[in-house]
C-alpha cells in the first residue's frame, strides 16, 4: 500500500541514520575505549603502572558512549512509536512485515548491548581505573 511504502521510506531513513551513528560509535569503542580497557586489565594482571590515557580518565569517553547510547535509545523509542510497536498495518506487504520483525530484533540486540556496557563494562572499568590510580 501507499501508506506502507511511505512508512517504509521513513523507517528506512531513521534506521540508516542509526547505522551511520552506530558505526561511528563502534569505531570510538574499538579504537579508543576498548584498547585502554585492555591496557588497564594488562596493568592489573602484570602489576605494572597504569599507562597514560590521552583522554585523561576513562570517564570522559565513557560519558560520551553513554550519551550516544541514550540518543540511540530515544531513536528506537521513536521508531517503535512510529511503527506501532513494530506492528505492520493490515494491508502491509510481507516484505514490510519482515522488515519490522528484523528491526525489532535489531533493537532488542542493541538494547542488550547498551545494557551490558552501561551496567557492567563501564562501571567496572571506572572502578578498575580508580584502583589502579591508587597504586604507587
What positions do the PLM features span?
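Short, small-residue-biased leader/transition segments that mark boundaries at the very start
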Residues: 2-8
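Short, structured motif recognition centered on aromatic/hydrophobic residues
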Residues: 22, 33, 121
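Short amphipathic alpha-helical surface micro-motifs
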Residues: 2, 15-16, 103-104
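Long amphipathic all-alpha helical oligomerization modules
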Residues: 37-38, 42-136
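Long, amphipathic alpha-helical coupling/dimerization segments that relay conformational signals between
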Residues: 10-22, 26
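Conserved alpha-helical segments that form or flank metal/cofactor-binding pockets of metalloenzymes
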Residues: 26-38
